[in-house]
Amino acid sequence: MEGTHCTLQLHKPITELCYISFCLPKGEVRGFSYKGTVTLDRSNKGFHNCYQVREESDIISLSQEPDEHPGDIFFKQTPTKDILTELYKLTTERERLLTNLLSSDHILGITMGNQEGKLQELSVSLAPEDDCFQSAGDWQGELPVGPLNKRSTHGNKKPRRSSGRRESFGALPQKRTKRKGRGGRESAPLMGKDKICSSHSLPLSRTRPNLWVLEEKGNLLPNGALACSLQRRESCPPDIPKTPDTDLGFGSFETAFKDTGLGREVLPPDCSSTEAGGDGIRRPPSGLEHQQTGLSESHQDPEKHPEAEKDEMEKPAKRTCKQKPVSKVVAKVQDLSSQVQRVVKTHSKGKETIAIRPAAHAEFVPKADLLTLPGAEAGAHGSRRQGKERQGDRSSQSPAGETASISSVSASAEGAVNKVPLKVIESEKLDEAPEGKRLGFPVHTSVPHTRPETRNKRRAGLPLGGHKSLFLDLPHKVGPDSSQPRGDKKKPSPPAPAALGKVFNNSASQSSTHKQTSPVPSPLSPRLPSPQQHHRILRLPALPGEREAALNDSPCRKSRVFSGCVSADTLEPPSSAKVTETKGASPAFLRAGQPRLVPGETLEKSLGPGKTTAEPQHQSPPGISSEGFPWDGFNEQTPKDLPNRDGGAWVLGYRAGPACPFLLHEEREKSNRSELYLDLHPDHSLTEQDDRTPGRLQAVWPPPKTKDTEEKVGLKYTEAEYQAAILHLKREHKEEIENLQAQFELRAFHIRGEHAMITARLEETIENLKHELEHRWRGGCEERKDVCISTDDDCPPKTFRNVCVQTDRETFLKPCESESKTTRSNQLVPKKLNISSLSQLSPPNDHKDIHAALQPMEGMASNQQKALPPPPASIPPPPPLPSGLGSLSPAPPMPPVSAGPPLPPPPPPPPPLPPPSSAGPPPPPPPPPLPNSPAPPNPGGPPPAPPPPGLAPPPPPGLFFGLGSSSSQCPRKPAIEPSCPMKPLYWTRIQISDRSQNATPTLWDSLEEPDIRDPSEFEYLFSKDTTQQKKKPLSETYEKKNKVKKIIKLLDGKRSQTVGILISSLHLEMKDIQQAIFNVDDSVVDLETLAALYENRAQEDELVKIRKYYETSKEEELKLLDKPEQFLHELAQIPNFAERAQCIIFRSVFSEGITSLHRKVEIITRASKDLLHVKSVKDILALILAFGNYMNGGNRTRGQADGYSLEILPKLKDVKSRDNGINLVDYVVKYYLRYYDQEAGTEKSVFPLPEPQDFFLASQVKFEDLIKDLRKLKRQLEASEKQMVVVCKESPKEYLQPFKDKLEEFFQKAKKEHKMEESHLENAQKSFETTVRYFGMKPKSGEKEITPSYVFMVWYEFCSDFKTIWKRESKNISKERLKMAQESVSKLTSEKKVETKKINPTASLKERLRQKEASVTTN
């Protein structure tokens, strides 16, 4: 890799003091100071920031080139005057260059996105250092310049190896900005190329953009201004041309320009931007040398053709891997007031140059007026800025006091050429961050590219709508750059201020055709006259980790933090303007909503609200996340690479694109040479790291990730952080669940309360409705009673008789006669009918009487129809009554001529048609009034009212039919009413009429019906099985139903429930309870039941309520009282129930209590006596005393004891033998059984000590409890006796006996028993005290008396152990005795000798058989 030496001097006007420090390519450092103004004109601001770039010895210097390094003129042994002279010359050339460039039709532009397949290029104009560098500390990041910046990357730091930058630059994956060498002299104007002045912090160290120095296809300016940059480019790989990325820190770098006729990019002298030769090919420095008079001897001829340029660029490409540039930048940064340098666009025939003319002091406007230049000046030097741009620029200005910004410039700097230098920040204190964190320029604005047509619009006064210039956000001086397409070359270019304002006017409206384009390079515009690439900014994927490193690194370096600096790819609409090129379209506007950047304004403010933060705001182009750019990498080193030699502006191009480490040299040759590039490709080259001096070592592996790669979780946090986060989430989850549960419980509680209230309210409403309904039933019964009674009286005969009404007309009319008689008699009761008229109905032929009787019948029938529902008609509907009734069916109590019965018998067959004279009444629906019916004129005929025409239904057997018929049609026999319902006899009735008498006589005419003498017998035999009583009046039935339904409760709900449960569990009648109480008999009612009755007896207040209800209520209402109330009332009816029950209960309680006391006293008495009087107890104690004295023999304190405390008895089992085989208790028991118990081992043997269980029971007794129980029994006895006296006084005499006699006898006996138990208790206490004294026992420490529990527990433990061992030893002794007995028996048997004679088996047949059998069995 060959390294290039480039001294980039970015000037700012200095009034009082200027210290210039230079870094020779060989590493020599010189510097000089001077006072006073050092500028010949206003365009030369003096050396504000003089950056010294020195490369290490391992870098191959540019001396290999035939031309001298352009910066060597400053480092020769020449006086300051000569240097200044050279600087002034450079200034003149820079002005001329800028003038030509501005007057040219094609200016470097920037395109974004994928347009025609061309890679968008971001041309950056680096403003003069006086605008750029307020202080090196203002730079948060360094230029992502690749090898061009190698020397400037750490200008203030000690020389560092370029390996760090190679790490960041080496892997630029795609170099899409290919320069196309169309022809040797073919001019390559930048048609529609916008120059972006700044990109907020360029990509990460590994993804540093390559800043392509503007390259002109035609001749360069006389002074080879690009020599330094070309030499610097050599240090890069050929595929990675890099130019210093500009940022706000550069102030207003002069925008990059291209001379349309030049084969190389023209850089104004102010901006010593480093440029690489065509794609990665180092450009010969001589080209710039001639353009810049005397600046650099190493530059080649400015008039070189593109072919020569290509050759020159190929040379550095070959040497790219040779040099290892390590740059050292020494920077002095001084704050100067914001200044705007007017850019005058002049037209030149052969080439276009932009001359930045020296402006008067008044031309340097303060921040507030930066973008609001007068119209005259705008006319001379640029298009007038519209008010919208001015407002945007002003709004984006920051207060002068913001020191953390790129520059804190006072607004009062208007007209100032040189200012008192501020602090000089030593470059040695620069950020020590790794190489990847040293690059970056906060991009504040980017201008969208438009087609050449739009540039013409800009000249017409549009606010940079058609301009293709993009400015770095320069704190003081903005280098305007306006270029037009070649076709527009002859037209005057818009003024620089307008271009500047447009660049900074981030709030300008976005063009409708302004679109974000993808990073894919777009093909050349067909309208371009020469092969020219569309410059776009390709979004460069960057590693978020690098940005985080930048965040951590850059803000902490001596106020060098751009508090708001955003990455170079900040083309996002929210943060910065976007540069795009829209083919053919309307003017490109900066994206709306993006604040305009104003020189001298802090980056935070210029970024707009929400972007002003203490930490760098990472902004990225739409396709590139802000995380992908190394904020830390952008340090002051980048500005140091660009010290302006004469205050001019170097034109740089950014090329943003996907990471591609190297492109073929041929591809780069194809790219347009006159284009400005800003490479934003991530640099993944690992080869450069070997040649870099590591400041802070940066890991080579893992390689930087692009945006497409997924981030690993492990890279962001550790396992501990992960666990902590999980725990935190779990804790929050748990708290949230608890809160939800609490809220749920509270809500449920409230809902339950509301539900209970609603339920109570509804229950109360139900009760009120029940009472109201009850009241209405009671109130309405009387009215209905009369009607129902009259109905009941009238209905029964008809109800029964109608069952038989079946057949023809004659037989049907006969029962009516009998019914009429009963009806007359029945209707006398309600007295609603005219009795006199009814009595006249008996003659069958008396039609007048019949008609007269109709009137009261009609009235009663109408009343009945209203009161009762009409029963179903058993016959066809009769004609209406004269009074207008609907039918006669609901009027049963009619005279003999009335209609059929009301109940539903089987309908009879229709009667025969009557004569026409008798058939006249219409059907029921139209009831015509019959006014003549009360007094019919013709007694024998039908009513005079004729029927309606056309109506002749068969007349039913009704009123009018009967009127027209003779009396013979009525039944001859009266109706019979049995006393009880009888079974029906289903015969066919024959009724003899008067007509039939004239006919042939029949049996039925002469047959007489006898009277039944004993109908009761007949009724009994043939009555219905289920006797149906006569229906009572409806009023009575309703009253009964109400009584059944309603239950009156006087007790509380729970109280009533408790008493109800008691009643259901008793299974007793009240008589049994009364008998048990009166007779003091617990055989039927046990004591538990009696106690339950006593406990649940009615209290005084309850009894008052019940008694009051019984006194005030009727008998029927008393039956409605609930059972618990009735039970308590009946129980209270027993005289003195409470006193009687208490006496009976106490009788049993007393007997149980006195028995328990007696048993306890007896246990203590017996145990005490046993210990005192049993001889074996004394023997055992004596044996223990002997063994103890023997064991304690020779001991003066324990030996020779006369006795011992009984506390040792339970502890004897703990005294083990020597071999631990037995303990002392075992030996005592064995010894006692061996020597004291003569019956040991036999059934006669008796346990020598009292039973352990007796001692245990005695230990549970307390004399205090016994005394209390006795006193309690005595009190209860006296109280019960008093209650017995009360019962005897108050109870009636009949209920007094046998209660009185039994209770008196009990109390006498109870008193005697109580006195006896008291004496027993006293004796037991005395016996216990005697025992204690007898054994010499003393109370425990802290106790006054010895309690039975203490004494008897000692004996209980000892006796339990003794008994267990005694049983075992007794068994052993029994076994020994049995064994001895067996042995004695054996001895006795052995002493006796038994002689046996052997038998010869052969001689005895029997013996032989026996042997044979034995042998057989054995076999």
Swiss-Prot record:
GO terms for molecular function: actin binding; microtubule binding. It comes from the Eukaryota. Keywords: Actin-binding, Cell junction, Cell membrane, Coiled coil, Cytoplasm, Membrane, Nucleus, Phosphoprotein. Residues 972-1388 form the FH2 domain. The keyword Coiled coil applies. Phosphorylated on serine and possibly threonine residues. Residues 456-842 are annotated as: Mediates interaction with alpha-catenin. SMART domains: FH2 (SM00498). Interacts with alpha-catenin and may interact with tubulin. PANTHER family: FORMIN HOMOLOGY 2 DOMAIN CONTAINING, ISOFORM I, FORMIN-G. This is Formin-1. It comes from Homo sapiens.
